[in-house]
């Protein structure tokens, strides 16, 4: 129904045109003409022109973003060329998500090694809710644009955030609610799953401004040249917040006015002398050498006699009080490691002296030794957490200490504990020093930790097979495997390792044969000795062309084997007799 005013107007127009009551068709045509916008006359032209769509359906072109504008956030990329994916992700974060202060680092150029190499992008979000929304949108962009399934760490989803807010608001303690939620969603880490040809990934950190300043992730991923730019500056305490004594004095204004109008023609400070300048310079040098007390403490401990009774906990507390938590060098870590070892050796010798003297009270000495041992293990975690670089010497020294602990108590349960500690210790080097797993010293000490005079680990044979399959067995490692298998009386594994798993070069080595025979004679039985001769295992010397006469140790061990087995080497098989006596087959 049309309104009365409009309908009366249309009726008057129709009467003027026709002079009679209008029909329905004529009324509809007049109403269409009256209320149309005047563009239906040229229907062909209007359908082809872009203005035929209403203004609210016409698409407006997206304006180009002026990156030179000071109001547009800058993106800081590494000096080296970066993949297009990094550029696209950073631009999307800036243009679509509103992330500011975007910085990208290439971890291959970082001053410290990283667990996962690639490109790390840092960006600031305005709030925790902005960070949650940006995380969701960025993961959706990566999924639709590149077809990957990114992963995120940190924070909670928006739905979970709302649930927790409602749950905490029902408790009525809004202060604790806001504090709890703020710590869970102010930092997001997104693994984009985008990799280049070298296997380098892209990792995005979305942080609030306060969280970013607190973590200072730039100091971890920057290069050595940029390290000074991102180093945290320790602000000196200011006295501006302290109250002024004159604030409560009603005559303070008159006093300041009098001081402004007065002139002083004298100085209350003493004149500078040569002694004063010398003392000032000495004070400045002492400030620069602020680590001197730390090294003096370690030197004083090293100069103490071996029989001195020490309290390890007190010494370590003194060390922590003088420890510098910034600008740490390898010299600082060497001092800490030396102090830990000195304390351990002191307590170890004290325990040994007490055991030799048949002392009844050994509990406090064992507690001190256990404390020093655990402190040495915690050293590796502490150094890695404070961006220190672990080295081979520290690992070898720690393995020697673990061998000493094994000698004190070498039961099966203790071997299992040492093996578990060894796994945790090697995990620190898994990503930073993987070549150490091929090192001869590390491998030999690892083998020693698997067996004792009282027990052996079930994993010993598997570890020996692992060394065989990976090709880590050189002469020294093969000799140590033979000695340990013989000590554990694993005769079947020993024969398999010697005659089937050992390479031809090692089987032709006279020193390997000499240690093999000596280990058999030291830990074997007459039945085993006879079986080596009867089953023809000794004939491998002839097959491999080993010169028995050239190695006196091998020759004497072979003669002793025949003698202890009840055989006469001179009356043995002619082939073997000539080989033993002359060093060659006739």
Swiss-Prot record:
Protein name as catalogued: ATPase synthesis protein 25, mitochondrial
Purpose: Probable mitochondrial mRNA stabilization factor.
Subcellular localization(s) per the UniProt record: Mitochondrion inner membrane
Taxonomy, superkingdom: Eukaryota
InterPro entries given in the database record: Atp25, ATP25_mRNA_stabil_dom, NT_sf
Alphabetical UniProt keywords: Membrane, Mitochondrion, Mitochondrion inner membrane, Transit peptide
PANTHER family in the cross-refs: ATPASE SYNTHESIS PROTEIN 25, MITOCHONDRIAL
Protein species of origin: Eremothecium gossypii (strain ATCC 10895 / CBS 109.51 / FGSC 9923 / NRRL Y-1056) (Yeast)
Residues covered by region (Disordered): 39-59
Annotated Gene Ontology cellular component terms: mitochondrial inner membrane; mitochondrion
Taxonomic lineage from the root: Eukaryota, Fungi, Dikarya, Ascomycota, Saccharomycotina
Family classification: Belongs to the ATP25 family.
Targeting signal (transit peptide) range: 1-35
Membrane topology note: Peripheral membrane protein
BP-aspect Gene Ontology terms: mitochondrial gene expression; mRNA stabilization
